[in-house]
Regions:
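C-terminal and inter-domain tail/linker signature
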Residues: 1-133
Length: 133
């Protein structure tokens, strides 16, 4: 990202995350707050070899960028101690980053892991109006 200073914050964050979700974890090395993501993604890629992140939308307000992704994949490897199930999953990710002078200086992400574990059958789904609750 040598030309990061010429990019708007949304482009910086989208570029970094697109590279990371595409398997290029080296792009995370120089971005504080993204180190944990670099440690977790190889495990996700192993569990979901066909993992895909589909950009949905973003919002920019000053230094802050919010990005919404839809993530999909087929569970073909171990995930947090759970053996492969061959089930397809679809879940959401919302990330908020703060970009200062072309650098990501803060990064927070909320991943829909509960939806993943419901789809894999680990956590039962209970409808909000289910009288059995």
């Amino acid at each position: 990202m040598t030309d990061a200073l010429s990019m708007d914050p949304a482009t910086i964050v989208r570029t970094v995350l697109a590279a990371a979700y595409g398997g290029n974890l080296a792009v995370l090395a120089d971005h504080p707050g993204l180190g944990a993501l670099a440690g977790a993604l190889p495990k996700v890629f192993q569990a979901f070899p066909d993992f895909r992140a589909e950009y949905q939308q973003h919002l920019v307000e000053g230094e802050r960028v919010a990005i919404h992704w839809i993530l999909t994949g087929t569970h073909r490897g171990p995930l947090f101690g759970l053996a492969a199930t061959s089930k397809a999953v679809r879940f959401q990710n919302v990330a908020i980053a703060r970009v200062v002078e072309g650098r990501i200086v803060q990064f927070n992400s909320e991943v829909g892991w509960l939806a993943v574990f419901v789809q894999l059958g680990v956590v039962p789904f209970v409808a909000p109006n289910d009288p059995a609750r």
